[in-house]
A protein has these predicted regions:
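Feature captures the catalytic cores and cofactor-binding loops of soluble hydro-lyases/lyases
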Residues: 1-58, 72-102, 106-114
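Generic structural signal for buried aliphatic residues
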Residues: 62-63
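Channel- or pocket-lining gating/hinge segments that regulate access to a cavity or pore
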Residues: 68-70
């Protein structure tokens, strides 16, 4: 793993039980029985690639969870993170108002997020 935090695959993986036992997150397009023996080869190293049609380059942030994966290009990282933290703050205010008894329609009109 050499310091990797996880792996993003544009296709199926196998040996999923072993991968899960490693506690190493792997985001993939499915599970299948085939290996790459005789079919796989290294074409290039450390070059931009496309994964599910999205460009992924060295230095990009990749966030993944049970709901999916998002790639944040390094060039807009600061802007995207600032917007994400603003959204989290807004969601917290929304939740606080709902817990305080405010109606959903009012809270949505006030903040524009749920």
């Amino acid at each position: 793993m050499r310091g990797a935090a996880g792996a993003l695959m544009d296709g199926a993986v196998r040996d999923i039980k072993a991968i899960r036992a490693m506690n190493f997150p792997v985001f993939h397009g499915g599970i299948g029985p085939l290996d790459t023996k005789g079919r796989g080869r290294v074409m290039a190293i450390d070059v931009p690639v496309r994964c599910a049609g999205v460009k992924v380059a060295r230095g990009d942030l990749i966030f993944g969870d049970a709901d999916g994966v998002v790639v944040v290009p390094q060039a807009v990282e600061a802007q995207v993170l600032a917007l994400a933290f603003d959204k989290i703050k807004g969601e917290k205010r929304t939740l606080d108002d709902l817990r305080a008894g405010q109606k959903l329609g009012y809270v949505f009109a006030k903040y524009g997020i749920l």
